Amino acid sequence: MKFNIFKMKIAVVGATGLVGAKMLEVLAERNFPITELILVASEKSVGKEITYKNNLYKVVSMDEAIALKPQIALFSAGGNTSLDWAPKFAEAGITVIDNSSAWRMDESKKLVVPEINAHLLSKSDKIIANPNCSTIQMVVALNPLHKKYKVKRVVVSTYQSVTGTGVKAVEQLMNERAGIDGEMAYKYKIDLNVIPQIDVFTDNGYTKEEMKMVNETKKIMGDDNIKLTATTVRIPVIGGHSESVNIEFENEFELNEVFELMKSTEGIILEDDVINSIYPMPMHAHNKDAVFVGRIRRDESQDKTLNMWIVSDNLRKGSATNAVQIAEYLLAQNLV
């Protein structure tokens, strides 16, 4: 994206974590126009040095970051940190783009996937919520279909990378594969296993992750009438999240039209050639920004219903890239 305005002072809060590191990587790759970079983390990390574009930057505290007055702060430091600190940044006139779940369902906050609803943003939005990783990739594919055929009901099962849990989960997987004892991020082994629980269980028997997908989808797409049920599963994979998605529409569709929609939608790469065994896989989505869609076919058990397979790198489009794209939009529209 090209910018016709002055460069910006940017803070990355949670710079020492997996998503924070990925945010720095994405900012560099996309040549985000930064005049001053402020790296922020917990008190125990203050003073630590991190490299960005061959320059070393020292991690500073939250209070120091606010005093430096960046125009935008990209937050990826967990929900509690966001609840405590995002309002303080906002009160100082800093626009916060928050990757945690803290503000997503707050009625006064926008929940943004740029390809879908960035047009809703205004200068008064000082805390902007970045959606859940598994929700983002799904709604990017659902949105054009909803516009044309009107989504009635979605059944989604996810196969989610350990990177969604964080550094300790990746270390657990690698240690188990190497036969090394180490700290457990999960209650159970993850190598050679799948765990049908992501986040804690709620009173209705669903996990918080599953309910995030239900509630966030409705908010992002601006339609509370969409019915959705989800089962979210952690698998021993690094590269990204995969989803089996079954979509029932109000209106009839033609498969060739669905293929054309996926081909023409910004942010989607269609990989669907079953004769040559071409379909999305996390090992191919790894370190890419696109949402990959394939295995498109009719549900032969029910009318007006479609099956598809959706894969994306959860640390990029599912987290860091989506946040940076929001920041790019704010700059391009002169909203900061």
Question: What are these regions, as identified by a protein language model?
Answer:
Residues K2-I190, N225-K227, V291-F292, I296-Q302, ...:
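N-terminal Rossmann-like NAD(P) cofactor-binding subdomain of oxidoreductases
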Residues A73, V162-V336:
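Charged docking surfaces used in two-component/phosphorelay signaling
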